[in-house]
UniProtKB/Swiss-Prot annotation:
InterPro entries, per database record: Ribosomal_uS7, Ribosomal_uS7_bac/org-type, Ribosomal_uS7_CS, Ribosomal_uS7_dom, Ribosomal_uS7_dom_sf
Signal sequence coordinates: none
PANTHER family for this protein: RIBOSOMAL PROTEIN S7 (PTHR11205)
Subunit structure: Part of the 30S ribosomal subunit.
One Gene Ontology term of the molecular function aspect: rRNA binding
Protein's recorded name: Small ribosomal subunit protein uS7c
Top-level taxonomy: Eukaryota, Cryptophyceae, Pyrenomonadales, Geminigeraceae, Guillardia
Organism: Guillardia theta
Length: 156
């Protein structure tokens, strides 16, 4: 076993405009080739689009979208006696948020459209309205966990 002490998790710093850790975590997911300012501009433009379309505060729409996309359970492969079982496990809060952000950015990139900020805004609004690809992904994960409920006693 390693003698070195475990590192403490670094908390994401809040972003400069909305003072939200979630927005900063999203910035890191959007980031490409170290261009953080561009990633922030994409997010802030997306939030402006959300505010114009919904008339609500964009950060509240974003937070509700994250809550709705966050999975509660997932399946992990566990090898027992030569066969591999998909064992349903509860998702911790931080991992759930991370997965939600990852799915929202992934499906926003895959959308057809002109600008990334428009695609991101549409994906966030769809997630807040419980439609869209990221919500479908969450439901698919939950369905897999439900189907493999019989192997729940193999939890580790």
């Amino acid at each position: 076993m390693s003698r070195r002490s475990t590192t403490k998790k670094k908390l994401a710093l809040p972003d400069p405009i909305y003072n939200s850790r979630l927005v900063n975590m999203l910035t890191v997911r959007i980031l490409k080739e170290g261009k953080k300012h561009l990633a922030q501009r994409i997010i802030y433009n997306a939030f402006d689009i959300i505010k114009q379309r919904t008339g609500e505060d964009a950060i509240l729409v974003f937070e509700s979208a994250i809550k709705k996309v966050t999975p509660l359970v997932e399946v992990k492969a566990r090898r027992i006696g030569g066969s591999t079982y998909q064992v349903p496990m509860e998702v911790r809060a931080f991992r759930g948020t991370n997965l939600a952000l990852r799915w929202i950015t992934k499906y926003a990139r895959e959308r057809a459209g002109k600008s990334m900020s428009m695609k991101l805004a549409n994906e966030i609004m769809d997630a807040a309205n419980e439609t869209g690809s990221s919500i479908r992904k969450r439901e698919e994960i939950h369905r897999m966990a439900e189907a493999n409920k019989a192997f729940a006693h193999y939890r580790f």
